[in-house]
C-alpha cells in the first residue's frame, strides 16, 4: 500500500506498507523507482473517465480503495472524473498530463521509514527542487499523524463520516485540547529555561501569514502566567518604517514582507533597554497613515517578566544579533496539514492559510477575494525568502492546522469565492478552491471557542 503523506523537503513524503509486514528497505524503494521509470519510458497514457459518482465508487470499492469510497460517498457530487494508467484506476482532483512520458524530472529516494518523491523546481522545472532536510517539521507531522490514527482518522472521508455521525463537536474539542496541551508544554519549557543559569529572557514567535501568530501569542501568555511568569509582548509590525521608507519591489509596489520593512535597529535598541531594566516607550504603527507613532505606550520588565516578540521576522538572526542566543526561545508556527483527501491526494499546506486569509480579509473589509488571490503569489515568494529559511532554527514548532478546519471554513469561504468575477485571472484559483471545499461536509462554527486560533479568521 502506497500513501502520499504530505509535502515536505521540497518533495512529498511517501509511506509504503509491504504485504509481508516487513520494514521498507532501500532495495524496495529502488524496485518501485525502476517500475516508475519503465512507465515513464513507455509513455503510458493517462485516460480520463467522467462518470456518475456511483460508478466511480463501485470501481474503487472493487479495488479495495476504501479511502476513495469514503471520500466520494460523502462529497455530495453527482458526476466525477477518475483516471486510468494502464490497468490501474485512481482518482486525482486536478488535471493530469496526457501521458507519463511528460514526467521527465523526478526521483524517489529512501527517507526515514518511507521515501521522498522529489519533483521539479517550480521556478526551474528542468531540474529537481533542492532537497532540504526538515527533521523538526517531519517530527511535528509524525506526531499529528499518530494522533489522527488514535482517533481513526486517516483521510477526509473518515473526518466527513465522523461529522455525519454527529461527532463534529468531539473532533473540535479534541483538536482544541491537543493544541492547548502543546501550548502548556511550550510554556513549561520556557519557564524551565527561564529558571536555568542561561535564563531565557525573550520568546520570539514567527510563522507565515495566517498561521495564527497573534492568537497563539495571547494563549501562550495565559499559560506563562499560569507558570508564574509575567509576559510582556509587542509585535514587530509596530516597528515598521514609515511607508515612504518602505522597500519596493521591481514593479514599484511596496515590499511589505521585506526584512528592512522593520526598523530592526530601533527594535533591538529598545529590547536591549528592556532587558537591562529600563522603561521604554514603544511605538504603535498607524496602518492608515503609514506612520510609526509614539502615543505614550510604555513597557518594562520586572522580576519574573519575560518578553514576547511576535512577527514575520522574529526568527531572523539579524533582528536581535547583539543578544546571546541562550537568552532567546524561538517558536515557529505553521499549518502542517496531516489529513489528506485520500491515500494519493495530499492537501497543499498553503491552502489552509490562503482560505483563512481570504475569509479574514473579506470579513474585515481589507481586501476582496480577488485581491487576496492576486497578491498570494507575492506573499508565498516572500515567505520562501524571508520566513521559511529559519523554520528549522526554532526551539519548538507549533502546528496550528485544525482537524475540521476546511469543513468549518467552507460555509464562510464559498460565498466569498463566489464574488470573484469569471472574466478575471484569479477566477481559476477561486474555482479550484471552491471545488476543493466540496470534498468537505459543512460543520458549524458555533462550537469553535472564542479563544480558538480559528476564531480569529472566521470572526
What residue ranges belong to the model's regions?
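Conserved NTP phosphate-binding and transfer environment spanning the P-loop NTPase/kinase superfamily
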Residues: 194, 320-459
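P-loop (Walker A) phosphate-binding loop of NTP-binding proteins
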Residues: 208
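Conserved glycine(s) of the Walker
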Residues: 212
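Hydrophobic positions on the alpha1 helix immediately C-terminal to the Walker A/P-loop
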Residues: 215-220
Amino acid at each position: 500500500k502506497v500513501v502520499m503523506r504530505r509535502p515536505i523537503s521540497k518533495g512529498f513524503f511517501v509511506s509504503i506498507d509491504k504485504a509481508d509486514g516487513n520494514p521498507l528497505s532501500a532495495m524496495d524503494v529502488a524496485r518501485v523507482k525502476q517500475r516508475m521509470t519503465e512507465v515513464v519510458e513507455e509513455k503510458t497514457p493517462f485516460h480520463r473517465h467522467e462518470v456518475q459518482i456511483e460508478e466511480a465508487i463501485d470501481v474503487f470499492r472493487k479495488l479495495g480503495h476504501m479511502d476513495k469510497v469514503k471520500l466520494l460517498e460523502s462529497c455530495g457530487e453527482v458526476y466525477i472524473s477518475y483516471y486510468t494508467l494502464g490497468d490501474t484506476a485512481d482518482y486525482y482532483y486536478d488535471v493530469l498530463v496526457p501521458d507519463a512520458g511528460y514526467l521527465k524530472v523526478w526521483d524517489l529516494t529512501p527517507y526515514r521509514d518511507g521515501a521522498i518523491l522529489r519533483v521539479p523546481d517550480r521556478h526551474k522545472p528542468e531540474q529537481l527542487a533542492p532537497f532540504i532536510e526538515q527533521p523538526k517539521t517531519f517530527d511535528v507531522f509524525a506526531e499529528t499523524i499518530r494522533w489522527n490514527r488514535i482517533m481513526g482518522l486517516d483521510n477526509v472521508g473518515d473526518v466527513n463520516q465522523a461529522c455525519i455521525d454527529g461527532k463534529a463537536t468531539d473532533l473540535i474539542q479534541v483538536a482544541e485540547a491537543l493544541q492547548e496541551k502543546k501550548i502548556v508544554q511550550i510554556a513549561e519549557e520556557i519557564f524551565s529555561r527561564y529558571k536555568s543559569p542561561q535564563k531565557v529572557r525573550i520568546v520570539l514567535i514567527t510563522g507565515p501569514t495566517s498561521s495564527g501568530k497573534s492568537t497563539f501569542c495571547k494563549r501562550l501568555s495565559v499559560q506563562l502566567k499560569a507558570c508564574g511568569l509575567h509576559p510582556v509582548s509587542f509585535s514587530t509590525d509596530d516597528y515598521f518604517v514609515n511607508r515612504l521608507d518602505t522597500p519596493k519591489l521591481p514593479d514599484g509596489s511596496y515590499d511589505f514582507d521585506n526584512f528592512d520593512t522593520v526598523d530592526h535597529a530601533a527594535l533591538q535598541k529598545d529590547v536591549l533597554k528592556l532587558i537591562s531594566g529600563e522603561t521604554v516607550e514603544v511605538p504603535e504603527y498607524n496602518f492608515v497613515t503609514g506612520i510609526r507613532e509614539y502615543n505614550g505606550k510604555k513597557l518594562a520588565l520586572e522580576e519574573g517578566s519575560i518578553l514576547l516578540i511576535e512577527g514575520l521576522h522574529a526568527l531572523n538572526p539579524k533582528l536581535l544579533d547583539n543578544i546571546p542566543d541562550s537568552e532567546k526561545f524561538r517558536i515557529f508556527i505553521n499549518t502542517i496539514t496531516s489529513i489528506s483527501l485520500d491515500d494519493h491526494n495530499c492537501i497543499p499546506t498553503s491552502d489552509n492559510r490562503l482560505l483563512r486569509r481570504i475569509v479574514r480579509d473579506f470579513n474585515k473589509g481589507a481586501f476582496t477575494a480577488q485581491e487576496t488571490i492576486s497578491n498570494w503569489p507575492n506573499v508565498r515568494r516572500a515567505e520562501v525568502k524571508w520566513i521559511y529559511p529559519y523554520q528549522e532554527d526554532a526551539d519548538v514548532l507549533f502546528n496550528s492546522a485544525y482537524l475540521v478546519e476546511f469543513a468549518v471554513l467552507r460555509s464562510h469561504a464559498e460565498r466569498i469565492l463566489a464574488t470573484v468575477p469569471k472574466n478575471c485571472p484569479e477566477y481559476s484559483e477561486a474555482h479550484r478552491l471552491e471545488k476543493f471545499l466540496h470534498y468537505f461536509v459543512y460543520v458549524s462554527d458555533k462550537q469553535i471557542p472564542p479563544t480558538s486560533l480559528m476564531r480569529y479568521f472566521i470572526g
